[in-house]
């Protein structure tokens, strides 16, 4: 499991407005936390036109490297740590540009300047 990998995971059970069900997620951490058996992820969900200007979403189109079936968004507002037991199959990987966009969106979600973190 590496940063930028896309996996199918089962996010159920959830509460309230948490994104749910079996869906793809992008892995954000490199797996250095070997004792934790947790990974930090952001979920992927189907594209909706009214999300066009949402700064927390990164658009991702289907392609050979990500192997997604439809235009989607990486929902950076729903960043979370999940157990490795939720992971199913590896689907693919996002591009370096998409990962950069994800990091920018997460810095907006968390209200931090990404340059301050370097």
Question: Language-model features: where?
Answer:
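Conserved functional hotspots at enzyme active or ligand-binding sites that engage polyanionic ligands
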Residues: 1-23, 27-118
């Amino acid at each position: 499991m590496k940063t930028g990998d896309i996996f199918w995971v089962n996010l159920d059970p959830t509460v309230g407005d948490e994104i749910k069900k079996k869906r793809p997620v992008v892995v954000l951490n490199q797996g250095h936390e070997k004792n934790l058996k947790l990974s930090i992820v952001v979920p992927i969900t189907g594209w909706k036109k009214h999300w066009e200007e949402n700064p927390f979403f990164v658009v991702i189109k289907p392609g050979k490297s990500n192997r997604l079936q439809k235009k989607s968004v990486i929902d950076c507002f729903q960043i979370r740590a999940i157990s490795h037991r939720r992971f199913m199959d590896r689907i693919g990987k996002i591009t370096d540009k998409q990962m950069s966009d994800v990091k920018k969106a997460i810095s907006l979600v968390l209200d931090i300047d990404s340059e301050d973190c370097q």
